[in-house]
């Protein structure tokens, strides 16, 4: 099995090719050995795949359906990002990244879902997609694999997804973020058409984006027989996912949070969700690493300042491979933004020195960020002992 991070020139791959040995991709192996014959519930989209998949897994598990799962994060309460399950149902995070060096289709075309959530669609993965239209074509390929009696659950507020379905759809379609379909209002009241199904007000996951993620999960669960009221009720006990507004610790009155956000839209939504929890008077210190291939290329740099504007202080780490100027991109934020390119520990010390009791430090990266959350907590502890 050859992962999509392995390319020509890799010594082991070259040996496999030289010997004429059989090989396959991870998604193809998964399709043939795990997903075949099962009711696959796939969650696709630029944002929210991991959280929505985890919510759906939680709902189905609470309903006693014992699904399998493969998710790009660890849902709290499962202790693992994958499990075989004990039923025909399988929840999978459906990623649009390419499959392997020999198969440049998106991974999700291998999964053959019976129920598919198309959560949202924006330009991303600038290292492999020339433009948004190229990604839309891959989503169209996913839709083409869904049977006539399958269900596509689509975000009605996405023009890109409108274009995807306009290319052709042969399956049942339900919309969310639609007054005629599934909707959730600012008070987190869920409706199907005009009929109230329940309230997400007690769901721990913060932010309107998570209310919309939950809405899609409820719709998908309904497709396999879970009553919406039961699904909504079960989300009251949804504990979240590792690295999605995950509290890593508190020290000297400062809370340190880790999040996977790396696309400007996700950064903005994450800060908005956190702001909703801490209030307007509390300070948010945003610590961001532009680490994804798209961010390293600078494709989204002009959107970065706007996505961070609701933070009170911004620290941007310029790591290896970032060949554009983050300081220039953050100029619209004025003096509240700083760019750093030294050792991670020195950045952690700088953040800890700036933090005051009552502040929340939000660290965002799609990588480990050098363990910065733990480092900040350690420096906060040292600073507290020195006082």
Residue ranges, per PLM feature:
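Structural motif
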Residues: 1, 42, 91-93, 117, ...
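Phosphate-binding loop of NTP-binding sites
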Residues: 4-154, 160-171, 215
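A conserved, hydrophobic alpha-helical segment in the catalytic core
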Residues: 7, 109-123, 199-240
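Beta-strand->loop->alpha-helix junctions that form or flank phosphate-binding loops
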Residues: 24-31, 69-73, 168-187, 202-208, ...
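Generic structural signal for helix capping and beta-alpha/helix-loop junctions
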Residues: 33, 77-78, 183, 238, ...
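Glycine/charged-rich beta-loop-alpha catalytic/anionic-binding loops adjacent to active sites
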Residues: 37-41, 193-203, 249-254
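A polyampholytic, Gly/Pro-enriched intrinsically disordered region
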Residues: 43-51, 94, 189-201, 336-339, ...
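ATP-dependent carboxylate-amine ligase
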Residues: 140, 167-172, 216-387
């Amino acid at each position: 099995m050859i992962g999509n991070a392995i390319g020509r020139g890799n010594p082991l791959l070259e040996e496999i090719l030289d010997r004429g040995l059989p090989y396959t991709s991870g998604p193809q192996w998964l399709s043939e050995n795990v997903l075949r014959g099962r009711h696959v519930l796939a969650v696709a989209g630029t944002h929210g795949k991991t959280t929505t998949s985890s919510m759906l897994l939680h709902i189905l598990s609470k309903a006693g359906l014992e699904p399998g799962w493969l998710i790009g994060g660890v849902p709290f309460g499962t202790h693992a990002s994958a499990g075989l399950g004990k039923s025909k149902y399988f929840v999978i995070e459906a990623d649009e990244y390419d499959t392997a060096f020999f198969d440049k289709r998106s991974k999700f075309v291998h999964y053959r879902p019976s129920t598919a959530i198309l959560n949202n669609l924006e330009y991303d993965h600038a290292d492999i997609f020339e433009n948004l239209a190229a990604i839309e074509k891959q989503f169209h390929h996913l839709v083409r694999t869904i049977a006539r009696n399958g269900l596509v659950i689509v975000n009605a507020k996405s023009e890109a997804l409108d274009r995807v379905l306009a290319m052709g759809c042969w399956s049942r379609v339900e919309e969310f973020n639609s007054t005629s379909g599934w909707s959730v209002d600012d008070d987190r009241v869920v409706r199907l058409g005009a009929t109230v199904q329940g309230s997400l007000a007690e769901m721990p996951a913060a932010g309107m984006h998570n209310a919309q993620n939950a809405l899609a999960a409820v719709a998908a669960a309904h497709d396999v027989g879970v009553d919406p009221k039961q699904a909504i009720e079960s989300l009251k006990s949804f504990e979240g996912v590792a690295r999605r507004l995950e509290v890593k610790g508190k020290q000297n009155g400062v809370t340190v949070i880790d999040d996977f956000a790396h696309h400007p839209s996700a950064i903005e939504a994450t800060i908005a969700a956190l702001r909703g929890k801490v209030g307007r008077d509390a300070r948010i210190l945003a610590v961001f690493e532009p680490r994804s291939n798209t961010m390293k290329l600078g494709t989204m740099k002009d959107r970065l300042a706007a996505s961070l504007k609701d933070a009170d202080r911004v620290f941007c780490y310029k790591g290896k491979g970032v060949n554009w100027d983050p300081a220039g991109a953050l100029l619209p934020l004025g003096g509240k933004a700083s760019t750093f390119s030294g050792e991670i520990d020195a950045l952690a010390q700088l953040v800890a020195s700036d933090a005051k009791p009552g502040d929340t430090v939000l660290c965002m990266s799609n990588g480990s960020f050098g363990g910065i959350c733990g480092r900040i907590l350690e420096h906060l502890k040292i600073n507290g002992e020195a006082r």
